[in-house]
């Protein structure tokens, strides 16, 4: 297929699909049992993992002299912000009830939801010549959106500042791990003869941050300041998502109450 363009038929169809699935999940399973939510989290996680494995193989296989050669592109290693559901969904699916799981739910309903929305609004960088990759990215980021929206409705009582701080702790931990990977590979790859690099979470101290707005901050301030702005900025965005979702949920409950009273 030709490389999709922002807001062409391919993109618009997937926007419609994600909106439809979001509405379906909220209407059908808003009050589902915790056991059912765990099953859904496990299923969505499995789907995302399978497509991610396929994606990684496609990025690792190249054609040289009419034969397939494995030459993995470490830049695409699955530890970006949008890869976080691969590591957080199992917590929602399998962890015991408690603060840690509540924070994971809050993370998926705020941070991860925001990341998915960003890709769907500005998808230019994720579309490419591989048809399967284009479907994978729409499925992956679409799942971030519709399951994030669903979790916000299902666990609406957990949408609070306390759990947002817990979600921020998860995000910060992932960012620190990403930074360690960036630093270690920067020094290890040349010694190992690997002609590639990592910029996980786009916070490498050695390579520019390509994200909108943050790319300007990266070049304008010392790196430690950039890192603080990065984490605090995404926390603010996640908080905004939380407030928007709380408003939508409140409006939905109000409308449902009016419909019930009119019957």
Residue spans for each PLM region:
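Membrane-interface transmembrane-helix boundary segments in multi-pass integral membrane proteins
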Residues: 1-16, 165-168, 189-239
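Membrane-embedded alpha-helical segments of multi-pass membrane proteins
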Residues: 12-20, 78-88, 108, 138-146
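Alpha-helical transmembrane segments in multipass membrane proteins, preferentially the mid-helix core
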Residues: 21-26, 88-91, 143-161, 175
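Membrane-interface helix-boundary motifs at transmembrane edges
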Residues: 28-41, 95-104, 154-165
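Aromatic-anchored segments of alpha-helical transmembrane domains
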Residues: 47-57, 111-123, 171-182
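Juxtamembrane "helix-exit" motif on the non-cytosolic side of transmembrane helices
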Residues: 56-66, 120-129
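Non-cytosolic membrane-interface motifs at loop->transmembrane helix junctions
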Residues: 65-78, 128-139
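Membrane-proximal helix-loop-helix units in multi-pass membrane proteins
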Residues: 91-148, 152
């Amino acid at each position: 297929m030709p490389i999709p363009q922002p807001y062409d038929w391919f993109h618009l169809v997937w926007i419609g699909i994600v909106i439809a699935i979001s509405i379906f999940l909220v209407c059908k399973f808003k009050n589902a049992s915790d056991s059912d939510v765990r099953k859904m989290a496990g299923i969505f996680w499995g789907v995302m993992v399978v497509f991610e494995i396929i994606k990684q193989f496609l990025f690792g296989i190249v054609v040289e002299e009419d034969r397939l050669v494995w030459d993995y592109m470490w830049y695409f290693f699955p530890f970006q912000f949008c890869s976080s559901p691969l590591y957080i969904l199992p917590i929602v699916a399998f962890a015991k009830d408690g603060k840690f799981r509540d924070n994971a739910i809050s993370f998926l309903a705020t941070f991860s939801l925001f990341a998915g929305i960003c890709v769907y609004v500005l998808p230019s960088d994720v579309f490419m010549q591989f048809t399967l990759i284009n479907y994978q990215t729409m499925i992956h980021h679409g799942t971030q959106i519709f399951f994030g929206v669903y979790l916000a409705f299902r666990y609406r009582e957990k949408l609070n500042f306390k759990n947002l701080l817990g979600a921020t702790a998860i995000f910060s931990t992932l960012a620190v791990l990403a930074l360690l990977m960036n630093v270690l590979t920067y020094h290890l790859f040349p010694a190992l003869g690997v002609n590639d690099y990592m910029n996980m979470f786009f916070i490498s101290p050695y390579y520019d941050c390509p994200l909108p707005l943050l790319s300007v901050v990266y070049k304008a301030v010392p790196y430690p300041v950039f890192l603080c702005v990065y984490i605090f900025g995404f926390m603010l965005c996640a908080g905004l998502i939380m407030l928007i979702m709380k408003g939508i949920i409140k409006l939905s409950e109000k409308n449902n109450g009016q419909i019930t009273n009119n019957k």
